[in-house]
Amino acid sequence: MEQVVIVDAIRTPMGRSKGGAFRNVRAEDLSAHLMRSLLARNPALEAAALDDIYWGCVQQTLEQGFNIARNAALLAEVPHSVPAVTVNRLCGSSMQALHDAARMIMTGDAQACLVGGVEHMGHVPMSHGVDFHPGLSRNVAKAAGMMGLTAEMLARMHGISREMQDAFAARSHARAWAATQSGAFKNEIIPTGGHDADGVLKQFNYDEVIRPETTVEALATLRPAFDPVSGTVTAGTSSALSDGAAAMLVMSESRARDLGLKPRACVRSMAVVGCDPSIMGYGPVPASKLALKKAGLSASDIGVFEMNEAFAAQILPCIKDLGLMEQIDEKINLNGGAIALGHPLGCSGARISTTLLNLMEHKDVQFGLATMCIGLGQGIATVFERV
């Protein structure tokens, strides 16, 4: 079976969804920009030699509809002979895109693929057009479709206090801002055209979602966002609304070697699981455990983790049940996470994987694990190994 390697991984800056840098930039353009950039950064691979493009996106309507993967590829002037498909596993969509491409390569059905994902939550809101079947209430609590209430449930079940959530959220912003100031994101962010507050077109090379002024004291003043009577989850401890895209060049090790391209890491294992929709945010725990089992590893073998921060109330129970509470500052989301950077749904799986690869190199560790919860009760995880 072919070994799957990651040759390159990039992303756009994360733009604010409300009046942010990409308010006049379409999701297809963000995607096409990264497709062009990956090919330009790796000229040894001819675009026509791509076997497929797998692109994650959740709200596949309006500008993100009608197979945005193909639309973006055409905009990027990828040869017409290269196919493209849009993948939807809600929050895990672009990580699922990676898994789909990896399996194609493992089985010999492909040698080189572009994978990634996008979500423009300013143009296509998360709830746009959502119409749950009324019969679902026979099997699933209605609140299971309200992500904030599932986070509240996890907080109650695991004893996660408001103070713990506020502290974790402040940490996310502080870490992300420190990474920005130190240039830690420089290798992953591709400058992307957008508009400043005055409407002037400019190139953005930083995440505008981060709030460096965030403090625990300021967060403590916010009201609960989902359960106004007894809730603990606030807007400040929830993932920010942002627009962005991320992309990876995935190949067989043999093809990369033949082209003289140096792999950054290989895909050691992959896992997807289901869980109770009412605690959808717990999905990373069984997903990570299964991925580790497939890799023949334990959590202690992993040098760095990227765990998507849907909510502080959600990620903290996952960290706790993976036995990592004492290692947060050494291993978990060292450059901040979605609370600071935002969670553009279809983008985030590739985004956290891209950040993870850079952290693995910076920390000089062998193994890294990226994982995320998925709305309506799923979890997805990938173990990477440097090569």
From Swiss-Prot:
PROSITE patterns in alphabetical order: THIOLASE_1, THIOLASE_2, THIOLASE_3
SUPFAM superfamilies: Thiolase-like (SSF53901)
Alphabetic keyword roster: Acyltransferase, Cytoplasm, Fatty acid metabolism, Lipid degradation, Lipid metabolism, Transferase
Pathway: Lipid metabolism; fatty acid beta-oxidation
Enzyme class, UniProt record, top EC level: transferase
Keyword Transferase: yes
Enzyme Commission numbers on file: 2.3.1.16
InterPro entries linked: FadA (IPR012805), Thiolase (IPR002155), Thiolase-like (IPR016039), Thiolase-like_sf_Thiolase (IPR050215), Thiolase_acyl_enz_int_AS (IPR020615), Thiolase_AS (IPR020610), Thiolase_C (IPR020617), Thiolase_CS (IPR020613)
GO MF term list: acetyl-CoA C-acyltransferase activity
Active site per the UniProt annotation: C91, H343, C373
Locations listed in the record: Cytoplasm
Matches recorded under Pfam families: Thiolase_C, Thiolase_N
Cellular component annotations (GO), alphabetically ordered: cytoplasm
GO biological process: fatty acid beta-oxidation; phenylacetate catabolic process
Family that this chain belongs to: Belongs to the thiolase-like superfamily. Thiolase family.
HAMAP family found in the cross-reference section: FadA (MF_01620)
Subunit structure: Heterotetramer of two alpha chains (FadB) and two beta chains (FadA).
Physiological role: Catalyzes the final step of fatty acid oxidation in which acetyl-CoA is released and the CoA ester of a fatty acid two carbons shorter is formed.
Identification of the protein by name: 3-ketoacyl-CoA thiolase
